[in-house]
Amino acid sequence: MSTQSVIAVKQFSGPDKIAQAYTVPQPSAHVLSNANYDYDLCGSTNSTSLSCAIQSSNIKTESISSSSLPKILPFSTDSNGESSLSRMSQAEFSDPILSSSSTFCTSLYTSSPMNSGSCRKTGYLPFLPQPPKCEQQQNSAGQSSSSLMLLDADLRNSGHADDEHTDDLKDFLNLSSDCSFHGKCSAMAYNEQMEFQFLSEQLGIAISNNEESPRLDDIYDRPPQLMSLPVSSCSDQEDLQDARSPAKVQLSSSRSSSGTASCNKPRLRWTPELHERFVDAVNKLEGPEKATPKGVLKLMKVEGLTIYHIKSHLQKYRLAKYLPETKEDKKQEEKKTKSVANGNDHAKKKSAQMAEALRMQMEVQKQLHEQLEVQRQLQLRIEEHARYLQKILEEQQKARESISSMTSTTEGESPEFAPMEKTEDKAETSSAPLSKCRITDTDAECHSKVDNKKTKPQADLEMVHDE
C-alpha cells in the first residue's frame, strides 16, 4: 500500500500545451477518509459525490500554459450559488496575466491530516479556496472579471483540443459527463455583468443605488434586471467562447468614454446660406475678434443651432481669415515684382537712349546754325569788297576821261601860245610821270586791298571747314 501510482494525463496536440504528470501517493488504510462534495449546476438539484483521500500529497504542475489554465477547472463548486471559476482564479491566480504564452508554476500541498479533517468538516476540497460571503460576491466577481477577460484570447486559441482536455480532466476527477448548464442566455448575462463591473471599476461609477453617482444602467438605458442576475459558470467551452469576446469589452468601453466625454452634440452641415448668415452676424458684431458665440447665436436665430456649433465655426473663421500667405502666393508676387522691375529697367534704358539721341541731334543742329551764321557773314563781307572795287574802278575811269579831254583841248589852241604851250607841255610832261607814278601807286594799293579782302573770306571759309 506504500507504493505510488502515477496517473499520466494525455498529452495535448496544441503547440503551447505541455504534458503534465501527477504523482499521488497511495494513502495508508488508517488515514483514508471520504469527503462528499455537492455540485449545484445553475440551480439544478442533481449532485454528484466525489471521494478524495489525501494525507500529505504534493501536487506539482511542471508547466501550465495560459491557454490550458482556464480549462483545468471547468466545473464549479457552489454552496451559495456562486462561481467557483472566479473563486479559483481569484485565490490562485490573482497576479495579473501579461501574455498568453506565460507559464505558471503552482505547488499546492497539505501538510498534515488535520487539514483533511478540517476539509471534511467544511465540505470543501483542500486545494480550493473558501467561498466568499454574500456581501463579498460583488467584489470577487469584479476582480475575477479582469482575469477572465484577459484569458479570452487563450480560450479562442484552444481549438478542437477542448473536448479531449475536458474529458481527460473529468476522467481524472471522476466527474460525470452530464454536467451541463443553462446555455447561451446565462452566459450572455454573466458576460454583460462582468463588463459592467469592469467598467464601473475603471470609471469609478457605482452599480448600485447606494451612492449619489449615476448608475451604469441609467447611462446605457439598460433595464436593472440584468444587473441582478445570478452569476453562473459554464463548462461548455463553445458557449464561453461565443459569449466572452474582447470586441464587446472594447465596444462598451469606447461607448462609455464617448458617452461621458461628449455632450451628445448633434452634427450640423454648414450650407452657404447658413454661412452667409453667420458672416452677416459677425460683421454686425464688429468683426470676428469682437464677436462672441452667444451674440452670433442670438443674431442668427436658427433652429437646431447650438453655441458649440457657433464656437467651433467662429474659431475656424478666425483662423481662415488671418492665415499667413502661402509660399506659392509669395513666389507669384516675387515673380510679378521681378517682371515689373525688369520692365522698368528696360523703359529706363530706352528713355536714356532717346534722351542721348535728342541731345546729339540738338548739338548737330546748333553746329549747323553756327556754320550758317559764318557763311552769312562771309557773304556780307564779299559783297562789301565788291562794292569797294567797283567804286575804285569808276574813279579810275573818270580820271582817264579827264586826262583825255585835257589832251584834246590843248591840241586846238593857237601857235602863239606855242612856247607857252611847250613850257606848259614840259611842265605837264614833268608832272605827268609824277601823276602816273601816283596813279600806279594808288592802283597798287587798291589791288593789294582787294587781294587782302579776297584772301580774308578764303581764310574764313577754310576756318569754317576746319571747324
Curated annotation (Swiss-Prot):
Top-level division of the source organism's lineage: Eukaryota
Transmembrane segments: none
UniProt cross-references to SUPFAM superfamilies, sorted A to Z: Homeodomain-like
Record-annotated DNA-binding residue ranges: 293-318
Induction: Up-regulated under Pi starvation conditions.
SS bond partners: none
A Pfam family hit: Myb_DNA-binding
Protein name as it appears in the record: Protein PHOSPHATE STARVATION RESPONSE 3
Organism: Oryza sativa subsp. japonica
Species lineage: Eukaryota, Viridiplantae, Streptophyta, Embryophyta, Tracheophyta
